[in-house]
Amino acid sequence: MNGFETVDNIEAYNNLAEAIVTLACEDYRSYRKQLRKATSRLEMEQLAREKHDVELNIRLLNSKILEIEKFLSSPYGMMLSHQLGDVILEKLRNE
């Protein structure tokens, strides 16, 4: 067993995965809603900056997903990947 294989770490990775999905969905929905409401050029410029921030957030979240995938590709993680994958897929379906 290595440090990644404790119950607390598995639970933490599961919580992180759920938070990543939730945050990415909320950021994107918020951006799209504001974009529809934008009426002036200044609002559009501000939204373009916010879109850039959202894109940066998504890149950061993607790097966290890669960390999770690395863990899940470990021998111990592979045993858990189906269970965690099901949780993540269910969360995505519900969003």
Task: Please state what every model-predicted region is.
Residues 2-38:
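N-terminal acidic leader/helix
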Residues 41, 64-65, 85:
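Short amphipathic alpha-helical segments that mediate assembly, nucleic-acid/protein binding
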Residues 17, 32-35, 56, 75, ...:
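Generic alpha-helical secondary structure signal
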Residues 48, 53-76:
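Acidic, low-complexity, intrinsically disordered interaction modules
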Residues 22-25, 44, 57:
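Helix-centric, low-specificity signal for extended rod-like, repetitive segments
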Residues 36, 43-52:
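N-terminal accessory regions of S-adenosyl-L-methionine
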Residues 69-95:
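Short, compact, well-ordered microdomains
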Residues 32-35, 39, 71-72, 92:
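Hydrophobic residues in alpha-helical segments
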